[in-house]
């Protein structure tokens, strides 16, 4: 057998993350090991999977076909492994939880400690996505639960949800940013002249969400909400932040709120999970997440305690 599930997992990670280095981080390997596995796969199969003639390696037609069919095999293998363990014990081999970047993953640490105390043998894997990326991970069965997903879920069903409520976003800049002393409310014409810091939608296949980005505006894209906060505190751009993220920096004076002409409406979040073939681990996490108010408390106050 020239194909292995490990090589298909690496190929999938490269395609989703956009680079060998990012894929290596996801699969917990050094980049050179990922490069070696890809070249070995190409040698074993006798076909090029990546075209390396340009600035960035791109999948060949054969590589695209291998990726698409390989994803079917990965899903089937994962479902088989989980089914076998559920039949034997009722507990999944692994449970994947995707956490939207708007939610500090540290809020899950107390729940993970409770889950560890069960000694179920189920491995927990945490993923980080933004906006539609959380839904995509759920619908592609790369994740079993989505924590803090945007409430406007895609059509098609196959999942259940639990509302987390709304949170407020505020438009903020650093005190030394040019907009800090600009007349309020800030108009779209004024904002157009300044760079926005954004966490882009991480969905690769689904239609993406975009909030409050003006057509033609300069954009600094960062990988997480924590990076967005840091960039705006550093004065590298402007933009909306969820109030829970902004609050400590507003209290310290590291950020200031500016009124804008077009006020952003409050956003709604939810937990979502696959509603079919639920094992004991998924049931435990759903029951625990929907009965605890730690995330709702943070959304309301910004308090991580």
List each model region and its residues.
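A short LG(V/I)-centered, amphipathic sequence patch enriched
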Residues: 42-61
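Alpha-helical linker/hinge and terminal dimerization helices associated
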Residues: 7-8, 44-45, 66-88, 150, ...
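Short helix-boundary/capping micro-motifs
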Residues: 13-30
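Interdomain hinge and pocket-entrance segments immediately C-terminal to HTH DNA-binding domains
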Residues: 55, 85-104, 117-122, 167
